[in-house]
Amino acid sequence: METTPLNSQKELSAYKDGEDCQENGVLQKGVPAPGDKAESGQISNGYSAVPNPGAGDDTQHSIPAATTALVAEVHPAERETWAKKVDFLLSVIGYAVDLGNVWRFPYICYQNGGGAFLLPYTIMAIFGGIPLFYMELALGQYHRNGCISIWTKICPIFKGIGCAICLIAFYIASYYNTIIAWALYYLISSFTEQLPWTSCENSWNTGNCTNYFSEDNITWTLHSTSPAEEFYTRHVLQIHRSKGLQDLGGLSWQLVLCIMFIFTVIYFSIWKGVKTSGKVVWVTATFPYIILLILLVRGATLPGAWRGVLFYLKPNWQKLLETGVWVDAAAQIFFSLGPGFGVLLAFASYNKFHNNCYQDALVTSAVNCMTSFVSGFVIFTVLGYMAEMRKEDVSEVAKDAGPSLLFITYAEAIANMPASTFFAIVFFLMLITLGLDSTFAGLEGVITAVLDEFPHVWAKRREWFVLGVVITCFFGSLVTLTFGGAYVVKLLEEFATGPAVLTVALIEAVAVFWFYGINQFCSDVKEMLGFSPGWFWKICWVAISPLFLLFIICSFLMSPPQLRLFQYDYPRWSIILGYCIGTSSFICIPTYITYRLIVTPGTLKERIIKGITPETPTAIPCGDIRLNAV
């Protein structure tokens, strides 16, 4: 094909969007007919002039160093995009708003000073969580790649970050969907006239079962258990049939069937990509808000609701002097927004190039934080009602944390409300949809990463690859479906994600803002949005956000969690196992760095320079003209 050099800005400007153009100021005169497979031009990403693969020798002229090259860039092979902008927003909101917003935030809030906790939570969100959230959306949208291959365009030596993210996603899928399976089991059990966790007359109940809400006079002892607690522990989990991590017992076939159904729904929701998942989230992302509103109104009308709200929001300003409160605030906002999991990179990569990801970051972050806050009212109005009925203090009712808060305390409260069957059904449906959204997102992050890394292998076999991922996650979940599976869920939740994801996110931020460069990153953002991030964002990205992550990591390492579930204290060897699981994902990063330095030719200095220099250009829409210093 004949090519003509473009020697001036005027000549470049003469060509409009839609005309074929190649980098290094070369325009293709011929326009391929529809159906023809044309070569895609690439760009230099601001570092070096990269010849266009497949072009003739006459197009491969080097440009002297320290000069400015006019570069006309084209889009690479057509990438799937969201059908509508709202599909993307709902997917991100559905991912960020998960089960943790319902059970973790309310518990952490009242435990750390009530209304006073909102101050450190807001500060950590503004200076730590939201900047990292914005960073990942911008990176994904600009480079249009998943969490593995994107590093060849940023800082190749850190490609191990993508591998670590994928391994963490597998760990999460191995236990998170089990919690959804518990909710599904509760949902199925709710289709009865009398909810099965309201009485002590079932086959799984023990002599210690005592019903608070019984009309008969009761005597509550230290060994007494509620019907809801025994339904959860002895019927759903059957944890009494396990001796601990050393003897998990057999599989619960009921939970195996539940999780098979869940993975089937997941598969048919994501097998075709964002075109299908973007439609599913219209239900799974909006339904929880309808139910939250219903439960909020119902809870507010219950006797004693005001006691729960007062307990939830009454500020204890002295708590702010404790370091643990700030650590909990930082950890909560980080895990709530979810940077570092590769999901935001994947979702944003399907956006249009000039989509306003800055606005998206602010909107979705605000929605996520507000959802957490409102969920606290939903939970504590009901806890206040329970305290009123039991004639106890709210603090006595709100002892449970984590899944127990939902499956024991809240389930018991619902069971003793008027129209309990209806509220139980909608509540557990809400939990299922909250969980499914996050699972869609987590697996899509892995799928996008692998498909982008190996396009020639999996590009036309997405359905089969997704099936393989889902089956792998199903088999990985089996250990959590045993009678002692709840012990494994707790172990994975504490160690497989916490410190590992924080460390990965810290290295990601350092790689982007210190190696790729804050100026280059801001230039990329300006190219997409038309404006450059201000000094506030730059300071947060370069210094505050990395320190924010380092603060949480150091706090975790200095005060490792003392794990206890029900009456079971985790043995020391299980804590060591937990650290090994967490390290297994993080170790991907130094392993790849070592491998990269070994296989790259040249001196050590040359190897390092090559490792931190982008090797794969980023293509942007045709017609966009960049001034690249090369």
Curated annotation (Swiss-Prot):
Q: Mitochondrion as a keyword?
A: no
Please name the GO terms of the biological process aspect recorded for this protein, alphabetically. amino acid transport; brain morphogenesis; enteric nervous system development; membrane depolarization; monoamine transport; negative regulation of organ growth; platelet aggregation; positive regulation of cell cycle
PTM comment for this protein?
A: Phosphorylation at Thr-276 increases 5-HT uptake and is required for cGMP-mediated SERT regulation.
Write the record's keywords in alphabetical order, separated by commas: Antiport, Cell junction, Cell membrane, Cell projection, Disulfide bond, Endosome, Glycoprotein, Membrane, Metal-binding, Neurotransmitter transport, Phosphoprotein, Sodium, Synapse, Transmembrane, Transmembrane helix, Transport
What GO CC terms are in its UniProt record? apical plasma membrane; endomembrane system; endosome membrane; focal adhesion; membrane raft; neuron projection; plasma membrane; presynapse
Catalysed reactions, semicolon-separated: serotonin(out) + K(+)(in) + Na(+)(out) + H(+)(in) = serotonin(in) + K(+)(out) + Na(+)(in) + H(+)(out)
Sites of Phosphotyrosine modification: Y47, Y142
* Name of the molecule in the record: Sodium-dependent serotonin transporter
Q: Which residues lie on this side of the membrane: Cytoplasmic?
A: 1-87, 136-160, 272-277, 348-360, 444-463, 517-538, 596-630
Which organism was this protein described from?
Bos taurus
Provide the binding site for Na(+) 1: G94, V97, L434, D437, S438
Give the Extracellular membrane side ranges.
113-115, 187-252, 298-324, 381-421, 484-494, 559-574
SUPFAM superfamilies given in the database record: SNF-like (SSF161070)
Residues the record lists as binding serotonin: D98, T439, E494, F556, S559
Q: Which gene encodes it?
A: SLC6A4
Question: Which residues does Na(+) 2 bind?
Answer: A96, D98, N101, S336, N368
Q: How does it assemble?
A: Monomer or homooligomer. Interacts (via C-terminus) with SCAMP2; the interaction is direct and retains transporter molecules intracellularly. Interacts with filamentous actin and STX1A. Interacts (via the N-terminus) with STX1A (via the H3 domain); this interaction regulates SLC4A6 channel conductance. Interacts with SEC23A, SEC24C and PATJ. Interacts with NOS1; the interaction may diminish the cell surface localization of SERT in the brain and, correspondingly, reduce serotonin reuptake. Interacts with TGFB1I1. Interacts with ITGAV:ITGB3.
Q: Which residues are glycosylated?
A: N208, N217
Q: Which cysteines are joined by disulfide bonds?
A: C200-C209
Q: What else is known?
A: This protein is the target of psychomotor stimulants such as amphetamines or cocaine.
Membrane topology designation: Multi-pass membrane protein
Domain of life the protein comes from: Eukaryota
**Sequence similarity:** Belongs to the sodium:neurotransmitter symporter (SNF) (TC 2.A.22) family. SLC6A4 subfamily.
Which portions of the sequence form the region Interaction with RAB4A?
Answer: 616-624
Tissue spec. comment: Expressed in placenta, brain stem, bone marrow, kidney, lung, heart, adrenal gland, liver, parathyroid gland, thyroid gland, small intestine and pancreas.
Q: Which residues carry this modification: Phosphothreonine?
A: T276
